[in-house]
Amino acid sequence: MSEMLLQTRALTKQYGRHRAVDQVSMHIKKGAIYGFIGRNGAGKTTTLRMISGLASPTAGEIELFGCRGRDLSRIRSRVGCLIEGPGLYGSMSARDNLKMKCMLLGVYKRGYEEELLDIVGLGGVGKKPVKRYSLGMKQRLGIALALVGEPDLLVLDEPINGLDPQGIAEVRDTVLKLNRERNMTILISSHILEELSKIATDYGIIHNGTLLQELTNEELMEKCSERLEVTLDDPERAVPVMDRLGIKRYQVADREHIYIFERLEESAALNMAFAKAGIPVRGISVTNEELETYFLKLTGGGVNA
């Protein structure tokens, strides 16, 4: 069983009468890329701020690297974060921005800035002032700043928001490189499930401050994969029939639907087997679901802002 690097228990944040985060209990394994999905205003940033120590919970608990309570302030030195945009000095170069952060944290050493710039793909930027960077370059420099001190957990708040396709790809490649080459655990938020599905190993879906679901990438792909959708009155009666046919990959979705993820071409034979068992089938079809459609269905539809 994988080691849990971060857990929250009933984490809550209240602003006056508004509950921005409502009893969120999330679980992040060591070495994971955890995609934190939700619309704008769902509570993502507030949750990340509490985890990073930038805001205090109204209630609930955070456990980080096995520590909680008063020990959190000490252990948060192992957390790097980029929340609500990087704080950059536009007239300075990338190297000088990094040098200032290194000296502030007392981790300055010769060649360290160049090493960090190489990690995020900015090794060749030279002395160009940061104000002349593209938004994608600024985001990658923000990630480099978050890496100062060599954290074990990297927290990124909407790092691809507003980027063009090239910028998104560059940030995505940087995240994958950090995870694969340095075994860094990464908590990354976004409102774009399609993009996070290209890198995430696990997901938490938040809506109106409530964590609706946690699932692995494999579980998400299965939910959205091509399947045979069978509509009938009593799905539980159909289970023995599928067992006799040797069908193993199926899900009783609700009181009227079964999803079958194998032997999709045998729908006619399956329909006949159900009929022989006295189970009337009201509908049977091959279907699949787009990732964004699944997200919108889970959060009640509407436009994903």
Regions found by a protein language model. Give the residues of each.
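ABC-family P-loop ATPase nucleotide-binding domain
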Residues: 1-12, 301-305
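Generic structural signal for individual residues within well-ordered alpha-helical segments
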Residues: 76, 98-99, 114-117, 169, ...
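Short, charged/small-residue-rich alpha-helical element at the C-terminal edge
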Residues: 226-298, 305
